[in-house]
Amino acid sequence: QNGATTEEGAFALSRPLQAGAFNYTLNRDSDEDWYLRSENAYRAEVPLYTSMLTQAMDYDRILAGSRSHQTGVNGENNSVRLSIQGGHLGHDNNGGIARGATPESSGSYGFVRLEGDLLRTEVAGMSLTTGVYGAAGHSSVDVKDDDGSRAGTVRDDAGSLGGYLNLTHTSSGLWADIVAQGTRHSMKASSDNNDFRARGWGWLGSLETGLPFSITDNLMLEPQLQYTWQGLSLDDGQDNAGYVKFGHGSTQHVRAGFRLGSHNDMTFGEGTSSRDTLRDSTKHRVSELPVNWWVQPSVIRTFSSRGDMSMGTAAAGSNMTFSPSRNGTSLDLQAGLEARVRENITLGVQAGYAHSVSGSSAEGCNGQATLNVTF
């Protein structure tokens, strides 16, 4: 009528149509009417936005775990430590959003951390050390959809402040380390159709303990146990298809393992410099430097993970909530080496690898260099 038509190809969407958690297509039915229909799969932004909670909490845990309880060289003085760490982090495909698992992801991170002791004293047969640290870092993670296609990339700029309290029983060597940390996250999730930004706060508390045993004069074995509880709150926002809301995220971790390493006296001693004034502070050969090494295998169990992401529009009944699980078990191996290069300066390097063996726990690798200066 009046030149109108309903033939195939008469209508088409000029650009992808998204609303809430779905993509929509324009279809012509047998009755020659045209309808908007949602696709079976969720739009790519669903796994992309849900992974923001996981990425931020993974970073917070790695940052807190980069601090060794051994806050001084032989524990004799206050010290300042500068650490630089970088590595890979990600999660395997365990069924994705459709099965309630964390989306598959893979990316990198890096941070610079400055830490300093504020107080070191002896109390009732205990050595007590307190201090603070600050860190600035960045992570970038590529996220995949349930079908293995690219969902997008999440970038996070993070600034952190933390404090620690270390107690060591003087006679037995039994120690406990308490850490409290807060992080400000500024995140951007980019897909083919959207750029979504969210800011938020992450918090973390950790209690770690260990008891060293001497196997030989220079070899030590130290069983360790650590409990970590962390949380994250991200601001709600909106993208081109509707609102995006985040529920408070939290998760808990238990790490059980041991550290095996040398326990040599790190006294600098007299060097081989031909100048008398340098013999107590300079070495000519690397073989003369006091060195300790260590390896630390662990099992990490992640449990009680929570964190919702909701998407929808103003239309009634459009809201959908996704709660991917981060529970699982991973095996972790860290190894390190430290050398005293001056009377008051120690250099350390370490590397590690974590592998998920069940569930949606994180996996990745890391490398770190640390400069420790006592005063």
For the regions a language model picked out, list residue spans one by one.
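Outer membrane beta-barrel translocator domains of Type V secretion systems
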Residues: 37-224, 229, 235-237, 325, ...
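Acidic, Ser/Thr-rich low-complexity linear motifs
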Residues: 235-248
